[in-house]
């Protein structure tokens, strides 16, 4: 027989899983945001950093003390204030000690605290020693003066400061990074003098705009001599919005032809940069670099030497390529997301940030002055009682010695307060007997003057701000230094293309009748004398440079291009173009050339139509090429002819009927593709039936001689001889003399220049 179990839910809180999960996640998020990842605007520190600095001050590890083992500090921090992992705590401490990580280090370390090349190469905490740096006084000097609120530590046995009373806006000076839940912060470091100057400007001119503050704070200042190349207008926009990015670039100089990089961007590893450059060299993407060395040492923390292959290498172009392809140029995110005085995280612009910090600073100074005033007034009150005791010394001593309750009698007899009576009773009789009226009255006068000064300061907002201003200027003189990261206007870095990276050697590209291609070094190549496969032979050749594109034009008028350096060597018989390009079925490759992008060519069909085209328009990006020349029915492509001067050059066209026509090249249109305009008049039906068509074209510079070849016979035409054949573009042309009715080709003889 089963018994029913009655479950009692008395004293048990019932909540839905959704509600509980939501609340738990929210609590965790708030903890990470408020107590771990984001800094406070007052001192610019995260809780772990604040606890390390405070614990070190409590251990007496100020800038004038001896260094103590880091493990001692970490143990104190964990045991008293920060119950988390020791490695994370020590790493936070290391970061504050590294002069290449912090613009103004808070910890002065002794031992191995890491290197710029490898910041995490620091020794274990049992080996290193530390004390606070001189700059930490900015955060700690006013701590015991009633300036900040105190909160219980994690177990309630000790108190710790909720925020440190920073005399300077440390948040901007050292910057910070942090990733919370749903938000992050990235505050770059700044120059102390510049930020202090902006604070003074804001005190003098509360309505100052961000643009006006940027006159004092032009940009971040990292702990490296690398250049900030972000334009000033963009930097101002970052400060106006609280978001953006800052770009840094390495600094180099040329020594005896070698490139020496002597400053790297913030947190960039020299060894990683070396790996990146070496990787490009191994991949043969840096043919202009002969060698690479790392000469960094203790005297020169950064010295990377790049040795160019020759003195003809453009150093600026090479470095621009390296800036674009390696960490020699790096971008840093800026996100001024911080916990304000209201305890809420918010992205602030520069003016909001400085205004709120000044509000914090003025409040801190007011609390410091009030604390001192209270102390002065307490002392004056005690001195009043002490003076009464001195003036009635014998009676006071008699009361103390004879009365059972001397405190009550003293208070009643001399109208003393309880505090005054306690102070007199706590003073030894021997000291009471030694009291001097002049000393008491002298101390009273000094304290009364100080009381008046403090009351004046606390009673006037203007005088309080003036005091804050004076202290800012003094601290800037004491702890400030010159800017380390210059802000320089530089052109945007551009990576060199594969073609630009190739060495510019003279080459000749050879095309065979069957469409095989190869590339020979040099221009003095007997292309027709090269060995060809059985049944194949020489078709065309074009001289150029190895960093150019070879352009191929097929029998359908389509153009294709391939990098010349990628073509097979002429030591063999090459490879078929059809393996790398996809021409239409039945098409054959007719000609090849290596054009410069801005060079001009006349391209035509043997139907007598053509146009002028730029070299860059001959190139095609895809394997299928591009439609370049539209061919009328039955016509073929005539190889392009280079043009030197469009305005001065003449175009000569000859047909199979022995007709020759000359006209100015400028009469032809410049197109990117198409059929073009009529060059010489040939009836369309005669072209289609191949009864008559264009035999050849030639471009004649001024003063050149036109040489006609008909079999073994040649005819040279120059000067007045050519006038007979000049006419309007598109005419039929004039008949050539007997024996030259069938011209094979046109050649141009250019006289030598004086």
From Swiss-Prot:
Span of domain Topo IIA-type catalytic: 38-501
UniProt-annotated site: Transition state stabilizer, residues: 126
Keyword presence, Coiled coil: no
Keyword flag DNA-binding: yes
Any one GO biological process: DNA topological change
EC number: 5.6.2.2
Residue numbers annotated as active site: 127 (o-(5'-phospho-dna)-tyrosine intermediate)
This protein's UniProt keywords: Cell membrane, DNA-binding, Isomerase, Membrane, Topoisomerase
Gene3D superfamilies: 3.30.1360.40, DNA gyrase/topoisomerase IV, subunit A, C-terminal, Topoisomerase II, domain 5, Topoisomerase, domain 3
Enzyme class: isomerase
InterPro entries recorded: GyrA/parC_rep, Gyrase/topoIV_suA_C, Topo_IIA-like_dom_sf, Topo_IIA_A/C_ab, Topo_IIA_A_a_sf, Topo_IIA_dom_A, TopoIV_A_Gneg, Type_II_DNA_Topoisomerases
Membrane topology annotation: Peripheral membrane protein
HAMAP family, A to Z: ParC_type1 (MF_00936)
Job of this protein: Topoisomerase IV is essential for chromosome segregation. It relaxes supercoiled DNA. Performs the decatenation events required during the replication of a circular DNA molecule.
Name under which the protein is recorded: DNA topoisomerase 4 subunit A
Taxonomic placement: Bacteria, Pseudomonadati, Pseudomonadota, Gammaproteobacteria, Pseudomonadales
């Amino acid at each position: 027989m089963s018994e029913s179990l009655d479950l009692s839910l008395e004293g048990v809180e019932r909540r839905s899983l959704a509600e509980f999960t939501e609340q738990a996640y929210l609590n965790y998020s708030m903890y990470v945001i408020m107590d771990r990842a984001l800094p406070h605007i007052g001192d610019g520190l995260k809780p772990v950093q604040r606890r390390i600095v405070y614990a070190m001050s409590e251990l007496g590890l100020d800038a004038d003390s001896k260094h103590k083992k880091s493990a001692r500090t970490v143990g104190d921090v964990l045991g008293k204030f920060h119950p988390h992992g020791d490695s994370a705590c020590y790493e936070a401490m290391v970061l504050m000690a590294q002069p290449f990580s912090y613009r103004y280090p808070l910890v002065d370390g002794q031992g191995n605290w890491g290197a710029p090349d490898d910041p995490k190469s620091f020794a274990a905490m049992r080996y290193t020693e530390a004390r606070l740096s001189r700059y930490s006084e900015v955060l700690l000097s006013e701590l015991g003066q009633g300036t900040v609120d105190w909160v219980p530590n994690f177990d309630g046995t000790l108190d710790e400061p909720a925020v440190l009373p920073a005399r300077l806006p440390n948040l901007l000076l050292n910057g910070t990074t942090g990733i919370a839940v749903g938000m992050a912060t990235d505050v770059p470091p700044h120059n102390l003098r510049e930020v202090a100057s902006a604070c003074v400007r804001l005190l003098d001119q509360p309505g100052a705009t961000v643009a006006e503050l940027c006159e004092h704070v032009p940009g971040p200042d990292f702990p490296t001599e690398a250049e900030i190349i972000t334009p000033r207008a963009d930097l101002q926009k970052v400060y106006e919005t609280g978001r953006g990015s800052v770009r840094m670039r390495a600094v180099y100089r040329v020594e005896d032809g070698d490139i020496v990089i002597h400053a790297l961007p913030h947190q960039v590893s020299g060894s990683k940069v070396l790996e990146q450059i070496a990787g490009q060299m191994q991949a043969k993407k840096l043919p202009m670099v002969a060698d690479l060395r790392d000469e960094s040492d203790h005297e020169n923390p950064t010295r990377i030497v790049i040795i160019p292959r020759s003195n003809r290498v453009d150093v600026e172009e090479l470095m621009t390529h390296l800036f674009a392809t390696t960490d020699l140029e790096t971008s840093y995110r800026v996100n001024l997301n911080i916990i304000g005085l209201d305890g809420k995280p918010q992205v602030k612009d520069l003016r909001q940030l400085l205004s709120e910090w000044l509000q914090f600073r003025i409040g801190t100074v007011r609390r410091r002055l009030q604390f001192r005033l209270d102390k002065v007034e307490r002392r004056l009150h005690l001195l009043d009682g002490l003076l009464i005791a001195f003036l009635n010394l014998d009676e006071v001593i008699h009361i103390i010695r004879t009365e059972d309750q001397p405190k009550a009698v003293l208070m009643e007899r001399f109208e003393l307060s309880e505090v005054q009576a306690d102070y007199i009773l706590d003073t030894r009789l021997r000291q009471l007997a030694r009291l001097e009226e002049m000393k008491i009255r002298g101390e009273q006068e000094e304290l009364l003057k100080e009381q008046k000064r403090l009351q004046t300061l606390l009673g006037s907002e203007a005088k309080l701000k003036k005091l804050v201003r004076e202290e800012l200027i003094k601290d800037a003189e004491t702890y400030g230094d010159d800017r380390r990261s210059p802000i320089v206007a530089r052109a945007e870095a551009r990576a060199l293309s594969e073609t630009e990276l190739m060495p510019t050697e003279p080459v000749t590209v050879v095309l065979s009748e069957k469409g095989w291609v190869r590339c020979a070094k040099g221009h003095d190549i007997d292309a027709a004398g090269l060995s060809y496969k059985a049944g194949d032979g020489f078709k065309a050749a074009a001289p150029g440079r190895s960093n150019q594109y070879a352009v191929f034009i097929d029998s359908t008028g389509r153009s294709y291009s391939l990098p010349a350096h990628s073509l097979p060597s002429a030591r063999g018989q090459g490879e078929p173009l059809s393996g790398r390009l996809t021409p239409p079925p039945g098409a054959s490759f007719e000609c090849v050339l290596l054009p410069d992008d801005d060079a001009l060519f006349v391209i035509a069909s043997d139907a007598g139509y053509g146009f002028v085209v730029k070299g860059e328009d001959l190139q095609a990006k895809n394997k299928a090429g591009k439609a370049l020349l539209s061919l009328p029915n039955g016509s073929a492509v005539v190889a392009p002819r280079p043009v030197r001067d469009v305005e001065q050059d003449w175009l000569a066209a000859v047909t199979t009927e022995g007709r020759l026509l000359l006209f100015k090249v400028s009469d032809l249109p410049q197109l990117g593709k198409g059929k073009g305009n009529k060059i010489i008049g040939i009836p369309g039906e005669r072209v289609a039936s191949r009864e008559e068509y264009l035999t050849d074209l030639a471009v004649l510079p001024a003063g050149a001689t036109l040489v006609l070849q008909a079999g073994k016979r040649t005819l040279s035409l120059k000067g007045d001889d050519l006038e007979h054949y000049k006419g309007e573009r598109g005419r039929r042309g004039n008949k050539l003399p007997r024996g030259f009715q069938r011209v094979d080709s046109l050649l141009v003889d250019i006289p030598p220049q004086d």
